[in-house]
């Protein structure tokens, strides 16, 4: 059995860890040369912004809906990915990193109730309280 650890809206979420004022706001992270949206916050998705939307087509939402467009910060995302994968590695005996924000954790031989393990994973990687930011990165 395997667990999948997957960062939600990973690039956008990384930006909010160090800039908490962005949490809950419509936010897109833009590709190299700020050409198109490569990551979207939930609030940006609610505006109907599609993955890969060209910036010139959605820039009008800056004034009308408070959209924030940020240039990609790949060193930040790499650092946050390394932190996340280090935490994930301790959740089971094997780990297969699939992408910058996805990892499969082997659960063979893991003792205890898997539901409790799932709750531990959620606690490590997720909080909805802006004051806590991400408990796992202190």
PLM segments and residue spans:
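Gly/Gly-Pro- and Ser/Thr-rich, intrinsically disordered tail segments characteristic of DNA damage-repair
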Residues: 1-128
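Single conserved hydrophobic/aromatic residue that forms the stacking wall/gate
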Residues: 123-126, 133-138
């Amino acid at each position: 059995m395997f667990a999948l650890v997957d960062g939600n809206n990973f690039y956008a979420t990384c930006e909010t860890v160090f800039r908490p004022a962005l949490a809950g706001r419509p936010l897109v992270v833009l590709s190299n040369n700020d050409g198109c949206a490569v990551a979207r916050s939930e609030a940006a998705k609610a505006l109907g912004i599609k993955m890969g939307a060209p910036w010139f087509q959605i820039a009008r939402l800056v004034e009308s809906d408070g959209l924030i467009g940020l240039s990609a910060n790949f060193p930040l995302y790499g650092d946050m990915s390394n932190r996340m994968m280090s935490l994930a590695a301790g959740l089971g005996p094997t780990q297969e990193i699939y992408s910058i924000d996805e990892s499969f954790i082997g659960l063979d031989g893991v003792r205890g109730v898997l539901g409790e393990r799932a709750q531990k994973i959620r606690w490590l990687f997720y909080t909805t309280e802006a004051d806590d930011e991400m408990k796992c990165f202190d």
